[in-house]
């Protein structure tokens, strides 16, 4: 069974620096097996930096697009996943934002999938969404009370099967964004709205293995997502560098 870790990086060279830290932790701590590849969706400009970096290896495949030059388009680039010409070779997919570090073996993560749904970290509530991070104000609006479960999720870590249901969901989200531009927090509100609408979300299982924080992490969970908003990189990158060096100094502790 071939598995894919999917990462996108566009627009800002500092996100290539984050990518470097993420990929290094995948190698050192994630212990990804030989059947797991890393697909990096990026530009020709960043392709040069990646291919000449210390972390570049035969595990990495590059998917190139030179049309994304804004924060908004860079965030939405992940919706192109199923346009990758070799995507059908992979059975399971783990999408990761670049502002992530891995501090434990993550091979087991792929085995958590039980249904053809997106598995994501639970965050927020569509009925209490004053900043509209999850589409509560712009997309759900009067539909909120249609949902007994009003919990939302963070789209920075998403795990799913390579299946018709998810491929179709990505298509639906793309079309929704073209027709309705009311949501301002990039594509995350559209992920939340449509995944809930079509009952294609599990936002509980990954909570045991993913930590979302905007401070120095204090957890032994496998995946650390340093939050802070799209395009806001300075604090995130600083935390990632400091914590990565901490991990290197405490390798035996972190890998337990």
Residue ranges and their predicted role:
Residues 1-69, 88-89, 227-256:
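N-terminal anchoring/stem segment of glycosyltransferases
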Residues 17-20, 76, 80, 185-193:
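A structural signal for well-ordered alpha-helical segments within the folded catalytic domains
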Residues 42-48, 104-106, 208-211:
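Short, polar loop motifs at secondary-structure junctions
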Residues 48-55, 111-112, 216-218:
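Short loop/helix-cap segments at secondary-structure boundaries that form the rim of catalytic
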Residues 69-74, 127-134, 233-236:
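Short, charged, surface-exposed secondary-structure boundary motifs
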Residues 76-132:
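GT-A fold catalytic core of metal-dependent nucleotide-sugar glycosyltransferases
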Residues 148-233:
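Catalytic core and acceptor-binding pocket of nucleotide-sugar-dependent glycosyltransferases
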């Amino acid at each position: 069974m071939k598995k894919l870790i999917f990462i996108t990086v566009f627009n800002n060279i500092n996100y290539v620096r984050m990518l470097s830290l993420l990929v290094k932790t995948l190698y050192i701590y994630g212990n990804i097996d030989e059947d797991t590849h890393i697909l990096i969706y990026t530009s020709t400009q960043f392709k040069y930096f990646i291919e000449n970096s210390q972390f570049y290896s035969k595990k990495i495949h590059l998917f190139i697009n030179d049309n994304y030059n804004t924060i908004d388009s860079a965030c939405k680039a992940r919706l192109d996943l199923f346009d990758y010409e070799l995507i059908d070779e992979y059975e399971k997919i783990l999408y990761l934002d670049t502002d992530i570090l891995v501090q434990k073996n993550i091979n087991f993560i792929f085995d958590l999938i039980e249904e053809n749904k997106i598995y994501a970290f639970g965050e927020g509530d569509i009925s209490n969404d004053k900043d509209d991070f999850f589409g509560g104000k712009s997309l759900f609006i009067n539909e909120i009370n249609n949902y007994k479960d009003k919990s939302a999720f963070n789209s920075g870590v998403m795990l799913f099967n390579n299946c018709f249901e998810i491929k179709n969901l990505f298509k639906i989200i793309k079309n929704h964004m073209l027709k309705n531009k009311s949501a301002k927090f990039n594509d995350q509100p559209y992920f939340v709205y449509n995944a809930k609408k079509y009952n294609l979300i599990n936002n509980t299982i990954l909570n045991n293995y993913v930590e979302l924080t905007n401070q120095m992490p204090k957890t032994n969970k496998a995946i650390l997502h340093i939050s802070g908003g799209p395009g806001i990189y300075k604090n995130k990158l600083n935390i990632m560098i400091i914590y990565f060096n901490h991990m290197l100094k405490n390798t035996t502790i972190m890998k337990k």
